[in-house]
Structures are given as structure tokens and as C-alpha cells.
Amino acid sequence: MSPLNRRRFLQTSALGTAALGTACADNGLDRQLSYTTLGPALEEAIRLSEASALASSTRWSLGATLVHCAQSIEFSMFGFPQAKPAWFQQTLGAGAYQVFAWRGRMTHDLAEPIPGAPAIPDATPTSQALARLQQAATAFQAWQGALMPHFAYGALDKTAYEQAHAMHIANHLSHFIAKA
């Protein structure tokens, strides 16, 4: 194995181990939802938005969370405001995506905004946020143009991007539950 390949392998292995360890951490409510397409993820967003009350283990409201997820989809079509360096996207970022895709779910800091994205008011009305998420998903599914590189994962084709979006939404919505 060449030094460059060995380095890439070690970086990717370390990231994979860290990502798997994060999934095992006890961080309160985590339903561990898993979606690979946008349809079921949107269905869960609708279900939660219709609940009379929610329990959550995140700092963000459901409205703010849905806008954050919509931003990610929008940025995949029009470009992310800030990106990690190319070396990061091609090594650690690509490795993280591969681990998440292999597991069928992702984990990340649920209170970290997309780098450079406009701030999201926590009081964002859930109905408006859901409408924005649905519009973003519909636009993404109809999108015929080139997709922009993900700020961390780098270049993804449409199928991989849809899976990334679905896993992203699932990770966030896993931390909300409708109260009876």
C-alpha cells in the first residue's frame, strides 16, 4: 500500500470508528429512524408536524429543524455557502458518507448549522417550515441540472444525494416524538 493510500485508509478508518462510536452514545431520545429516500422522511415530518404536542431531545424546535433540512436540500441544487477543503471532502467527508450509507443512517451534531447558512429563528412556525421542506424536496426530485458538491461529502450523484438528505432528515426527526 502506497503512503498516500495508507494515509487515506487510516483517515477513513478513524472517521468510521468515530462515526460508529457516536451512534452508540446515549444522548437522550433517539428513535434511530432510517430512510434512504425522501418520501418516508417527508411522511414522518408531516406526522410530527400534525402532533398536538412533541417531546424532543434537541435544542432546536421542529420548525427550525425542518428549515435546516430544507436548506441542505436547497444548497445541493444551488451551492453551499461554505465548503470544507477539497482534501477533506475527498478523504474524511467521503469516508463519513460511505460509513453512513453502509449503516443506513447518519449521526451528526443536531444543533450545528450548515456552515455559512442564514440563521434560523427557533420560533419558525412548523407549518411554514414543513411547506419549505416539501417544496425543496419536490424541487430536488424534479431537478435536471448538475448537483453542487456537498460541503463535507463532496460530489454526490442524485441517488447518493437523496440518500444523504433522507438520512439527514431521519437523524433530526429521530429526536422528536409525538406525545399522546
Residue ranges, per PLM feature:
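N-terminal secretory signal peptides and thylakoid transit peptides that target proteins
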Residues: M1-L20
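Residues within well-ordered alpha-helical secondary structure of globular protein domains
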Residues: T12-L15, R47, Q71, A178
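Amphipathic, well-ordered alpha-helical segments in soluble domains
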Residues: G16, L38-E44, H68, S72, ...
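C-terminal segment of N-terminal export signals and the immediately downstream linker at the start
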Residues: A23-S57
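Short, helix-capping/interhelical loops that line the mouth of catalytic, cofactor-
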Residues: C24-L29, F78-L133, F140-Q141
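Short, contiguous alpha-helical
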Residues: A51-A101, A142-W143, L147-A180
